[in-house]
Design a protein with these regions (language model features):
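A metal-dependent hydrolase metal-coordination microenvironment
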Residues: 2-140, 181-194, 198-201
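Aromatic-lined carbohydrate-recognition surfaces of secreted/lumenal glycan-active proteins
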Residues: 144-156
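Active-site core of metal-dependent hydrolases
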Residues: 148-149, 179-180, 210
Length: 271
């Protein structure tokens, strides 16, 4: 019945070996699918600036084994790979896979850095243009934009700051469709204080990142309905996906406490 669709467990920020992820696209889909928990994931590998110094250093450090981003001439093959694997994911796991990309601007001055996800991307978008031009191109393609980790992180202090979109929110908020309120282990409460539409995602690069903040939303398991739900941002919630403890039917604990923790547990009578 419309309006009473089940909540979907979603991760809209996932990287594979097409950029700097640890797993192949196929293995990534199998990892999510075999949990039996996930309904929707978006593959969002990096599109880098031509002179990305961090990626250049990374390629040297990995002896060229990792490219860290998708080149323009590789992009059609990237979308074809996602399309092929998305059919298998839906058939084998009833998992909806959305094609995306993270248009990544890493500059020497942290205040100029912006990472923008395009969900349901159709064509390559260059990172060598202004953030507002990137956002406008995402709109032209009919894709959905997500501002990635838009504020200072409290946990991963060694990673670069990507605050450009937030610092210029008065000018850009009309072009940004959704903001990350949580990214892996970090919460960005500032986005909710402004009442911006929000999501929570893992920024997945390796298997342990599976256990992190995720999005719950109420919609049919089809991209047009999910897009509409994300933009409306009414039946949307954040959930922390933990190993062996997430229950889609409620909040009941299904894991186990260690004996030491049981010894410290004190139950109070209901008032």
């Amino acid at each position: 019945m419309p309006g009473y669709e089940p909540f979907l467990l979603c991760d809209f920020h996932v990287h594979t070996r097409w950029s700097d992820g640890r797993l192949t696209l196929r293995d990534t889909i199998d990892l999510y699918g075999r949990t039996g928990k996930f309904d929707v994931i978006a593959i969002t590998d990096h599109i880098l600036m031509k002179r990305d110094l961090l990626a250049r250093a990374g390629r040297v450090a990995t002896l060229g084994r990792c490219t860290f981003g998708i080149a323009e001439d590789q992009f059609p093959a990237y979308l074809e790979d996602i399309a092929r694997e998305s059919e298998r994911a839906r058939r084998q796991y009833d998992l909806l896979v959305v094609p995306g990309a993270e248009i990544t601007q890493n500059k020497l001055r942290g205040k100029k850095n912006a990472h923008i996800i395009a969900l349901d991307i159709k064509r390559y978008i260059s990172a060598d243009q202004s953030p507002d031009d990137i956002l406008k191109e995402i709109r032209r393609q009919g894709a959905l934009s997500v501002a990635c980790h838009p504020h200072h992180r409290a946990v991963r202090r060694l990673e670069i700051s990507t605050c450009y979109l937030w610092d210029h929110r008065s000018a850009l908020s009309g072009l940004v469709d959704v903001w990350e309120a949580a990214n892996r282990d970090d919460l960005f409460s500032v986005t909710s204080l402004k009442h911006f539409p929000y999501v929570a995602s893992s920024d997945f690069h390796k298997p342990k990142h599976l256990y992190s903040w995720k999005t719950l939303l109420r919609a049919e398991k089809e991209w047009p309905a999910i897009r509409k739900a994300l933009c409306a941002n009414v039946d949307v919630a954040l959930t922390l996906f933990r190993k062996d403890s997430w229950n889609p039917n409620g909040t009941a604990w299904t894991g186990a406490l260690r004996p030491a923790a049981l010894g410290r547990l004190r139950l109070r009578p209901a008032r």
